[in-house]
Amino acid sequence: MPVVTDPYKPGTPCWIDLMASDQQAALDFYRDLFGWQGEIGPAEFGGYAVCTLGGRPVAGIMAQSGPEGQPLPPVAWTTYLASDDADAAKAAIAGNGGTVLYDPMDVGALGRMLVAADPTGAVFGVWQAMDFIGAGVVNEPGALVWNELNTADTGAAGRFYQPALGLRPATIQGMDGYYSLNVGDRTVGGMQGIPKYLDPGTPSHWMPYFSVDDTDSVVDAVVKRNGTVIQPPFDMQSGRMAVVKDPQGAVFAVIQAPEAQLPDSP
C-alpha cells in the first residue's frame, strides 16, 4: 500500500474533500464503492468526517454549509494544495489574480487552511500541515491517484499556479492541449481545457481521479447506487478510465492503471 508519512511538498495536491447535501448518504456511497470507513465527526469541527482506507486518511466528507443568508456552495470535490505558509499563500493568490474565498483559519492543531479560486474560476483549497499532513494513502485502489485541472483558459491558469503556488505547467509530447503540473522535477497533476463530455457551460474545476482494480465494474457499481456515467469507460495511454457523478452530483474519475505507471504519490 503506497503510504505517505512525510509532509507533501508545497504545491502538491495533498488532500481532497467532498461537500455533500446529505453527508451520511455520501459516507454510505463511498464506503460501498471504495471501501472507505468514516462517520460524522465532532460538532466542533462541523461534523467533518475523515474517511480512511486501510486505517489511513484518504478523503474528507462534510455537509454543505456557507455564510448565513448566502446560497450553499455546490456539491463538489475540492482539491487541496500543500503549503508551508497559508497566510503567505493568501497574499500570493491575491497578487496573481486569484480570489480568496475563505481566509486562512486554524483547524485545531491539525493544520491551517484557506479556500480560493484561480483566475479562471476553479476552486481549490490550501493546506498548511501541522499534526495532519493530508492523505495517508495514495495510488491504491480506492485512493486518490491523480488531480486534474479542467479550465476554460489553460494559459491564464498556468500563469497563475506557478508564481502563486509553485505548480509549473509543462507540455507533454504527443498530447496536444494537455499539460503536466509539476513541483520541482516531479509531476503531481494535469491540466487541460474543459472536456467536451462535460455539460456545456461547466465551469473550471479540479477533478480527482481514484485508482480502481476494474474500471468497468466500478462504473457498474456507481450506476447501481444511483450515480450517473458521464464518460463511459475507455482506454488511454495511462490506463482505462471513466468519469462519473455520484447520486448527489459530485463528479470524479476512476482509472485502472498498470501498476508500473502508478506514481509513488499524487
Give the predicted meaning of each segment.
Residues 36-72, 118-119, 123-130, 168-203, ...:
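Conserved short beta-strand elements that form part of the metal-binding/catalytic scaffold
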Residues 12-21, 49-52, 67-92, 112-117, ...:
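Vicinal oxygen chelate
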Residues 91-100, 220-225, 266:
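Short, positively charged
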Residues 1-24, 76-79, 127-158, 170, ...:
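N-terminal beta-strand motif that seeds the catalytic metal site of vicinal oxygen chelate
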Residues 2-3, 8-10, 14-56, 95, ...:
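Core segments of cupin and vicinal oxygen chelate
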Residues 87-131:
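Hydrophobic alpha-helical segments and helix pairs
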Residues 155, 161-264:
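Structured core of small recognition/catalytic domains
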